[in-house]
Amino acid sequence: MPNSIPALPAQTVGLHPAQHPRAVLFDAYGTLFDVFSVAQLAETLFPGHGQALSVLWRDKQIEYTRLVTTCNLGAHYQPFSALTRAALVFAIKKLVINEASTRAKGQIDINFEAKHGRQVQRLLDQYQQLNAFPENLAVLQELKTRGIPTGILSNGDQAMLDAAVHAAGFSGLLDHIISVDPIRKFKTHPDAYALGEQATGLAAHDIVFVSSNAWDALGATWYGYQTLWVNRYHLPFEELGTQPTRTGHDLRAVLDFFP
């Protein structure tokens, strides 16, 4: 393959001093794997609701990670796979069942599992093999060729991450696949970001953390990582007074850290 991949211009905003990083860690969901690629199947299963269902599912999934991490010192922790299912069930109940109930003027009463259990399982199975963004494989191969250590640092369970990596064809391209599950705390808890330092043996300021989730890029920046926010959808960044080290529009922007 070519020695370099043309990268889109990246906006450097810079909290950290300019320095060459020694490793790269990627968020998984939304960054390497397209969480909204389930919308097509969702539309097939729930006509007229596919896009809205995929968005609400994702929003509720993130909300649940924060809820179980911050409430009562994590006493209500559940693995990411369980929260993913719970968020999906919530989204279906809100968007599909509530609408049907409204049309029936409140007279609808169903057994959720009997009526929707198969659809739920099909969507969860799809979540195990989400589409990867098209440039990602070439970027990971390029980093591997350059000898730059890479890894995933994700809220996902280990089994979920292993399945997604395999399905995307990324096996052998990542040196670390790090799940927060052993510490029972989701990002943006500082202990979650600390796992990257522990796995690589490097200080956070020597690592680029890459995420397409603005809240995640912000949390990693606050922790001390050099950060790349992959702003695929041309959105504003969080308005909390801190910017990521760089902003790009796809994963190729990470190569700008290694001129």
Task: Show which residues each predicted segment covers.
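Active-site neighborhood of HAD-like aspartate-dependent phosphohydrolases
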Residues: 8-62
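Alpha-helical elements of Rossmann-like donor-binding domains used by nucleotide-donor carbohydrate transfer enzymes
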Residues: 40-41, 56, 86-90, 122, ...
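Hydrophobic side chains within well-formed alpha-helices
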Residues: 38, 53, 119, 170-173
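Short, acidic loop-to-helix structural element flanking the phosphoryl-transfer center
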Residues: 77, 81-82, 101, 114-151, ...
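Hydrophobic alpha-helical core bundles mediating ligand binding, dimerization, or RNAP-core interactions
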Residues: 42, 57-61, 84, 123-127, ...
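A metal-dependent, Asp-based hydrolase signature
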Residues: 45, 51, 64-122
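Asp-based, Mg2+/Mn2+-dependent phosphohydrolase catalytic module
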Residues: 2-21, 141, 153-259
